Amino acid sequence: MASSSNWLSGVNVVLVMAYGSLVFVLLFIFVKRQIMRFAMKSRRGPHVPVGHNAPKDLKEEIDIRLSRVQDIKYEPQLLADDDTRLLQLETQGSQKIPFHAEGRHPCSLMGKNFRSYLLDLRNTSTPFKGVRKALIDTLLDGYETARYGTGVFGQSEYLRYQEALSELATVVKARIGSSQRQHQSAAKDLTQSPEMSPTTIQVTYLPSSQKSKRPKHFLELKSFKDNYNTLESTL
């Protein structure tokens, strides 16, 4: 009995030590993961180290090159007074070709595309009604290329844009003028009325014999009016 109890106590001690070691290992792993997690969040660099799983020599070379980056400095040099690029910038103001805008203005207003807005006006009763779609596309393509595009916008592109703009302005002005003339002619027709001939009022005097021949309903109406006036005066 004593030997069996000693054996059980030894087993219990071993189990307690095993469970304690397991709990300690789990706590150690958990704490280490949390520390690594907070360290990755607080650091400014990438979460994965640079050169991860790379050979040692390559990793050292990468670290050396990255450490040199912060020492690299570049001082821009000003252009000379007789530099051709500076002369081109000074003479651009006298050219007839417009500049490329800096892109500070949005391409659409209030969430609506200007191209679709002009195309919708073609189907309404406005001066833009019936304007060719190709004309609107040419005009807006040139405008967007000059303002927002990164390509070349030279003399030929500007002349094409100016031609489309002049054609659209001519069409709109012609239709506005025709509509104004129609309104003026309609207003003129309304203001001009035919001359009225002078009206003559004819008064016919009845003889005394016919004055007493009044209709019966007229006499009844007169008697009712007299009775009403009498009643109103008494009240």
Swiss-Prot record:
It is found in: Membrane; Golgi apparatus; Mitochondrion. It is a single-pass membrane protein. The keyword Transmembrane applies. One of its GO terms (cellular component) is mitochondrion. InterPro entries: C1orf43. The chain crosses the membrane at residues 11-31. One of its GO terms (biological process) is phagocytosis. Pfam families: NICE-3. Keywords: Golgi apparatus, Membrane, Mitochondrion, Transmembrane, Transmembrane helix. General regulator of phagocytosis. Required to uptake Gram negative bacterium by macrophages. N-terminal region is required for phagocytosis of Gram negative bacterium. This is Protein C1orf43 homolog.
